[in-house]
Every structure is written in structure tokens, then in C-alpha cells.
């Protein structure tokens, strides 16, 4: 079983790399009414309308620079700009991490061809990728073997997403299925369902999950209430909250923070605060996210 999970995890990483290479070869829209964003290999980004193209270059009509000619060999990516990405006249690039909060998922999935790498506190590592617009798969590891440890947690995170009403109501069903490599009978994880109300960048999410260890499942579910609100092109507020049934009573874990959304990297920073106890305790969260791939849009 462990070898199968390890092989599947490695296979996913190879598939991500192959899809990343394939995604770099993109079709150039021929419709001059379609607004696009062009990223170039020297790190620049241009938005506007393609008015002409030749085998060697693309002519883009921009609002601030007029018409510019961009050599095709310098084009790293071309993405169509959707109307919901124009906010108060400003182009907001996609937030590919909007399918989750600090750690917990919501009802949205990654778009086909879209992926990212997540690292939290150095040890936690996960890669997620959109196989289709409705199916996302992830693989993660805490590489304790690098620190003379033999027991290494590894996991898979499949998720199926169903848009009930596009950009307004989304359902997600999935799980985190893990083992500890180097230990016997070490399987554990959680199976969950998520209901997300609102678009990807501004929503509230209600979740219900049942955890398990080995063959034993929890008697009662864990409840999650989370949300995000993107306040600008480069920043979003986030909260992720849990209610655990610990037997005698419920344990509540609250969190609050934000996501700094760069074009090529994003930083998650926040505090997790247990609601019980007389003393105030706050555990910091720090994560780094790096996108890859190029999603396909309608």
C-alpha cells in the first residue's frame, strides 16, 4: 500500500511537470475584441487587444503605451481577460490559491492546467493540480527523512468540485488520505464536503468532515466555517475556523490573517487561536505559494 501511494505521488509530480511544459505552447487569440494579458520572458506584462500578428511578432493595443510589437519568441504566456477580472477599471490577475484558505479547502477546484506548490513552515510541502475543471489532485509530504527521521507523512488530496450556480454556489467533495512511511498501520485522514457561497475571491464556506485513523472513524464530524475577501489586486483577508468534538465538549479553533498575492508568488500569514482557556494563545501561520501551469478558459 505504501509503495503504491509513493509511486502515485511521484507519478503525479511527473505529470505536473509534463503538463507545465505542454501549457507553455499556447494559442494566440485572433479576435481583436478579446482583451488579453501577455507575460514576456523578461518579466514584463502587457494588457490590451491584439490588433495584428505575423509569424514573428504580435501587435498589442494597450491603454497606456499605445500599440506595442512583442516578438513571439519573448512571449511566456497569453491569457484571455474575463470581465470579472476588471475591478474598478483595474485588471486583477487570477488568484490560483482561491481553492483553499490557509490550509482547509473550499468548494472550488483548480481550473484545468492550473497548479501551485505550497510550503508552510518549511516542513509542509504540497503540489496541487487541476486535471479537469471539476477534478483537482494534490500530493504532499513532510520530509522528515531529510533530518535523520525514518517516519515520513505523505498524502494525497483528491477533490471533485461541482458548480451549482457559476461563481455563486459551489460544492466540493474530497479528502486527505495519508500514511506515515516507515510505520505500520499508519493510515489516517479525513473525508469532507464543502459548500461555498460567493465567487472565488469573496466567499464564505461551510464544511463538514469525518476523520479516521486506521479502520476507526470519528463518531462526530468536524465543522469548518471559513471565508475570504479580496480587497485589492494584491491582498485578500482570510479566516479559517474549526469546531472539534473532543468527547466531553467542543473545541473551537479560530484563525485570521491574509494573503499577499503576487504575480509569481503569494504569502499567507495569520494567527490560529484556540478559543478555550483563560490564557490568550496565538500560533502563527506562514506559508509560501508558487503557481505553475496555464489554465484553460471558456
Predicted regions mapped to residue ranges:
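C-terminal segment of classical bacterial N-terminal signal peptides
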Residues: 15-24
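Compositionally biased alpha-helical segments
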Residues: 24-116, 121-123
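Short, surface-exposed connector motifs at secondary-structure boundaries
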Residues: 106-111, 134-135, 234-237, 265
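Outer-membrane beta-barrel translocator/channel fold
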Residues: 148-228, 234, 238-298
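Bacterial N-terminal signal peptides that target proteins for export
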Residues: 1-10
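Short hydrophobic/aromatic-rich beta-strand segments that constitute the beta-sheet cores
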Residues: 60, 77, 119, 137-139, ...
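Transmembrane beta-barrel domains of bacterial outer-membrane proteins
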Residues: 110-112, 120-147, 151-159
Amino acid at each position: 500500500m505504501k509503495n503504491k501511494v509513493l509511486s502515485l505521488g511521484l507519478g503525479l509530480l511527473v505529470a505536473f511537470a509534463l503538463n507545465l511544459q505542454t501549457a507553455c505552447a499556447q494559442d494566440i487569440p485572433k479576435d481583436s475584441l478579446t482583451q488579453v494579458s501577455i507575460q514576456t520572458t523578461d518579466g514584463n506584462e502587457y494588457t490590451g487587444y491584439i490588433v495584428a500578428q505575423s509569424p514573428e511578432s504580435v501587435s498589442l493595443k494597450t491603454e497606456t503605451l499605445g500599440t506595442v510589437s512583442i516578438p513571439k519568441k519573448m512571449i511566456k504566456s497569453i491569457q484571455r481577460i474575463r470581465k470579472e477580472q476588471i475591478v474598478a477599471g483595474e485588471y486583477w490577475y487570477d488568484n490560483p490559491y482561491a481553492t483553499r484558505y490557509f490550509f482547509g479547502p473550499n468548494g472550488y477546484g483548480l481550473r484545468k492546467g492550473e497548479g501551485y506548490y505550497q510550503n508552510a513552515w518549511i516542513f509542509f510541502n504540497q503540489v496541487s493540480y487541476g486535471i479537469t475543471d471539476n477534478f483537482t489532485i494534490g500530493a504532499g509530504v513532510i520530509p522528515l527523512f531529510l533530518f535523520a527521521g525514518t517516519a515520513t507523512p505523505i498524502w494525497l488530496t483528491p477533490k471533485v468540485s461541482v458548480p451549482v450556480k457559476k461563481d455563486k454556489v459551489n460544492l466540493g467533495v474530497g479528502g486527505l488520505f495519508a500514511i506515515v512511511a516507515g510505520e505500520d498501520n499508519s493510515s489516517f485522514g479525513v473525508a469532507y464536503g464543502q459548500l461555498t457561497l460567493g465567487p472565488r475571491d469573496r466567499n464564505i464556506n461551510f464544511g463538514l468532515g469525518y476523520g479516521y485513523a486506521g479502520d476507526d472513524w470519528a463518531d462526530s464530524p468536524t465543522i469548518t466555517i471559513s471565508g475570504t475577501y479580496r480587497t485589492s489586486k494584491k491582498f485578500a483577508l482570510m479566516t479559517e475556523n474549526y469546531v472539534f468534538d473532543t468527547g466531553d465538549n467542543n473545541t473551537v479553533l479560530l484563525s485570521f490573517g491574509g494573503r499577499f498575492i503576487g504575480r509569481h508568488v503569494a504569502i499567507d500569514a495569520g494567527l490560529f487561536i484556540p478559543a478555550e482557556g483563560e490564557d490568550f494563545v496565538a500560533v502563527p501561520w506562514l506559508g509560501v505559494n508558487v503557481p505553475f501551469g496555464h489554465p484553460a478558459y471558456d
